[in-house]
């Protein structure tokens, strides 16, 4: 992440803690529940796979593999390591529309972050290219002497000015007031208007997914969800899983902690799990140049499963074949290693699962998608 002094901050949606207070107005819908469908961006540039890994690792303050760290420091490969692709090729460009003031922007609803900031007209013109821009000078009220700043695990970050403005998501409008102490999130403030203090994620493989707020749509999952308690002491949707499976190999006694993060692409798992999974794939190897596990693109990948009590959350092998490295016949895996707990379960895991985020507990429920 570059460090820009001209971005603009607003509310967080779905984490537990934030520095932003979002107060519901009288225009907030009172139906008790609503659904948001993701939108497909029609023209995108897809990132070189190691860059996406870099994003996930730095977001969760994880050590960077030497190759990824070296690339991030020197820029070079990240600057020219992108290719033009069809929109759904890597399942990374599904977003949600939000209106701030009079401007409609694309955002990623993210359970793994406590910050939400947007590109604004205060950025240099070059940095505004290929982005929808918020124009605070038209509808916002600038807070004097108020700034925001966020940093990531690799020492980079972003910063900017603070404005008040109206934020509208799926017809629900809130007025945002920023204060320099922890406050409720946007979701925390609308919970009292919902039938139940829950939201669910039903993300899809190569198709737009859905977020439901205030209810559980039983037509979207199979069987009864299996629940785990959440440890929210660090502001994350974090829990302990009781095992995993790689193909026919069952490891029902290997317990590990993980954050369920809708804003991260990969499954970032303990090294022992990662190595066991790729050991069954002919031609797979840890590619030091690209900083992650790779394999021949024509390889047939085995299923992977995470144990949630007695339920096995199965991830099809095709969901783990994340992307082809440009100019090669080698593909980058959707499972990558981390050496520090907790692990992170991102899009590669979520695209096959129906996940319930329940503030009453708190707890999370898991079931197979219908």
Curated annotation (Swiss-Prot):
Domain of life: Eukaryota
Family indicated by similarity: Belongs to the peptidase A1 family.
One cellular component term from this protein's GO annotations in UniProt: extracellular region
PROSITE patterns reported for this sequence: ASP_PROTEASE, PEPTIDASE_A1
Sugar attachment sites: 80, 102, 251, 298
Protein name as catalogued: Probable aspartic-type endopeptidase ARB_04018
E.C. no: 3.4.23.-
InterPro entries: Aspartic_peptidase_A1, Aspartic_peptidase_AS, Aspergillopepsin-like_cat_dom, PEPTIDASE_A1, Peptidase_aspartic_dom_sf
Keywords from the named record: Aspartyl protease, Glycoprotein, Hydrolase, Protease, Secreted, Signal, Virulence
Localization annotation: Secreted
Stated role: Probable aspartic-type endopeptidase which contributes to virulence.
Keyword Signal among UniProt keywords: yes
Domain Peptidase A1: 94-367
Disulfide bonds: none
């Amino acid at each position: 992440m570059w460090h820009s002094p001209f971005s603009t901050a607003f509310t967080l949606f779905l984490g537990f803690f934030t520095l932003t207070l979002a107060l519901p107005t009288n225009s907030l819908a009172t139906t008790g529940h609503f659904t948001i469908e993701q939108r497909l961006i029609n023209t995108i540039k897809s990132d070189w796979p190691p860059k996406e890994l870099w994003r996930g690792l730095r977001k969760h303050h994880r050590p960077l593999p030497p190759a990824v760290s070296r690339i991030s420091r020197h820029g070079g490969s990240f600057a020219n390591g992108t290719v033009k692709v069809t929109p759904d090729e890597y399942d990374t460009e599904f977003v949600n529309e939000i209106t701030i003031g009079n401007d409609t922007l694309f955002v990623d609803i993210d359970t793994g972050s406590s910050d939400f900031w947007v590109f604004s007209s205060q950025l240099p013109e070059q940095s505004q290219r290929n982005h929808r821009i918020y124009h605070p000078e038209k509808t916002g009220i600038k807070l004097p002497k108020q700034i925001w700043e966020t940093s990531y695990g690799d020492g980079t970050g972003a910063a900017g000015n603070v404005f008040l403005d109206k934020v509208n998501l799926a017809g629900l409008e809130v007025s945002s007031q920023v204060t320099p102490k922890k406050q409720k999130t946007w979701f925390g403030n609308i919970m009292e208007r919902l039938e139940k203090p829950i939201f669910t994620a039903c993300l899809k493989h190569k198709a737009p997914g859905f977020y439901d707020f205030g209810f559980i749509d039983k037509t979207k999952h199979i069987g009864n969800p299996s629940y785990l308690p959440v440890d929210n002491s660090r502001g994350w949707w974090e829990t302990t899983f009781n095992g995993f499976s790689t193909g026919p190999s069952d490891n029902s006694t290997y317990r590990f902690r993980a954050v369920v993060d809708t804003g991260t692409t990969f499954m970032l798992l303990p090294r022992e799990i990662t190595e066991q999974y790729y050991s069954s794939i002919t031609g797979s190897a840890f590619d030091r140049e690209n900083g992650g596990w790779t394999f021949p693109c024509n390889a047939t990948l085995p299923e992977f499963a995470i144990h949630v009590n007695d339920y096995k959350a199965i991830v099809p092998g095709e969901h783990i074949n994340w992307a082809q490295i440009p100019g090669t016949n080698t593909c980058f895996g959707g499972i990558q290693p981390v050496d520090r707990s907790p692990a992170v379960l991102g899009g590669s895991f979520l695209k096959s699962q129906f996940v319930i985020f329940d503030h009453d507990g708190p707890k999370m429920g898991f079931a197979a998608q219908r």
